Amino acid sequence: MRHIMAKSLAPTDGVRDYLAAQEKKSLLRFLTCGSVDDGKSTLIGRLLSDTKQIFEDQLAALERDSRKHGTTGDDIDFALLVDGLEAEREQGITIDVAYRFFATPKRKFIVADTPGHEQYTRNMATGASTADLAIVLIDARQGVLRQTRRHSIIASLLGIRHIVLAVNKIDLVGFDQAVFERITESYRQFSRDLGFQTIVPIPMSARYGDNVTSRSESMEWYSGPTLIEHLETVSVEEAVVELPFRFPVQYVNRPNLDFRGFAGTVASGSVAPGDEVVVAKSGKSSRVKRIVSYGGDLAQAAAGQAVTLVLDDEVEISRGNMLVSPAARPQVADQFAANIVWFDEHALLPGRSYILRTETDQTSATVTDLKYRINVNDFAHEAAKSLEMNEVGICNISTRSPIAFDTFAENRTTGAFILIDRITNATVGAGMILHSLRRAENIHWQSLDVGKRVRADMKHQRPAVFWFTGLSGSGKSTIANLFEKKLFATGRHTYILDGDNVRHGLNRDLGFTEADRVENIRRVAEVARLMADAGLIVIVSFISPFSAERRMARELMADGEFVEVFVDTPFEECARRDPKGLYARALNGEIKNFTGVDSPYEAPEKPEIHLKTLGRSAEEMVDALEHWLNERDIAQPPPADNGGSI
């Protein structure tokens, strides 16, 4: 019985032949984009229908859904094939990115249907990130619109170099050649600086199928290809096989003591047994001994193939490393310039710390300079202090540790990255690396003989940063001042960084916007780190309202060195105390961006020390702090490290 079942489940010769034929076809990834209601989903539905990709039960369901949700009268509404969300069907719009696979005898396709509404531009950018070609739809009645320009500019920024200009709904203007030519010329004028290699204009009616897969009888004046003819024949390959070899290591394959290989997918270029390879960041080299695949050893592996590489030598390599060609290595730097498309409802702020993830690396990163925002309607450069959702900007980025990369123009796989919010773990932005910053390559750490351990030994204490956070009027400065006096009286070496005092000097140029608050804390955290490196016990007393910046400050310090102290006083009590009269003015609207009133305060979730002040004196708070300090032997010299040799 088991033998019969296995035999019945085995692929037939016909299936094998079909699969073999599919493997030989090239794959084209493309997306549809343009303004809302230009017919993007309808076009994809028409393509799927005319290329026989719809089963009978799907067609029956489509006819039923068209009667319920359709916008085409008694005709089938092909847009419903790809608008799967209930909200999309109810509103007749696309919200999320929908991917569909289909094939013709000549080629395989993966198409991304992207939304047209401006508030979903980030979804469109997601679809464009892997596409080779973009179909930009334009309603023949409307011409080139704001969102048409926006999507075209984003497609250009994301490396798409081939455009099909689909002038849709041509039937609604009487198949007028003059309308088609006017729109074509308008789009060419707009896009002349966007770097597109090809722009192929095609007049069509997605609803009725004119010039989609069959030539229109109503447009004898048009002699160009139908849409499917162009998609089947367009050459978009960027010769990734001819690019320098890049192999991001996904994991170390070690099934037994006698085998050690490095598994991953070849991102670009090719490799063969005997080829020399280099670990991108360490510079260690070896040679490829074997290329192992599921079907056996290979004589060569090229871009797109998932393989395991076995090397001649026992080179230290782990997940996240990248094997590369020694003749054309990627750049390794901790500072670079990049295009960023912002996805999140909370703005990108220079100075705020994010997690940056590339094909190979993950590290902390900060936008050190927002150079300008790109107006995606006319490509103009605009001054900006932040990037809001769906905006695009050019930024300088600094990473905590060096990463290996190519520019996005050279390699779309190793030149791209995403930014992740440290608190929510949400992907908040996507970036394309433009170039490394020369100053990053020319600045090196100077080796110094006197280090943190030596300085701390001399003071007979362990460095620490006590970071006091809480609302204005919570008692931070009072408690911090008493705490320093008690430490100083016992012979400890201390320094207080107070929020108000620092704004008279180091941060006098900053205001109280969210962006300025982020920069305020970034500067203070760097100063606190330097003071801890000097062996001091640093007491920082700042409202520091945002969790992300407090986490950034923590990561600057050595393990166990950062002590978050939450001075927890209810808002009502702080407003009652109001020692500086600020709450009264803020509640009257005289002060803007006041924490707790019209600017948020994100309370610590797990502070090392939680001081609940209501009904307790400042002296009691200091006693609790000192008890915590003594329990952890902060007064004792730190353990030996490599921080100094004297």
UniProtKB/Swiss-Prot annotation:
Positions of region (Adenylyl-sulfate kinase): 462-646
Gene Ontology MF terms: adenylylsulfate kinase activity; ATP binding; GTP binding; GTPase activity; sulfate adenylyltransferase (ATP) activity
Cited Pfam families: APS_kinase, GTP-eEF1A_C, GTP_EFTU
EC number, UniProt record: 2.7.7.4, 2.7.1.25
Region (G4): 168-171
Residue ranges, annotated region (G5): 205-207
Keyword Amino-acid biosynthesis: no
Chain residues that bind ATP: 470-477
Keyword ATP-binding: yes
Renumbered residue ranges of the record's region G3: 113-116
Region called G1, residue ranges: 34-41
Region (Sulfate adenylyltransferase): 1-461
CDD domains attached to this UniProt entry: APSK, CysN_ATPS, CysN_NodQ_II, CysN_NoDQ_III
Binding locations of GTP: 34-41, 113-117, 168-171
Protein's name according to its UniProt entry: Bifunctional enzyme NodQ
Organism the protein comes from: Rhizobium sp. (strain N33)
Organism taxonomic ancestry: Bacteria, Pseudomonadati, Pseudomonadota, Alphaproteobacteria, Hyphomicrobiales
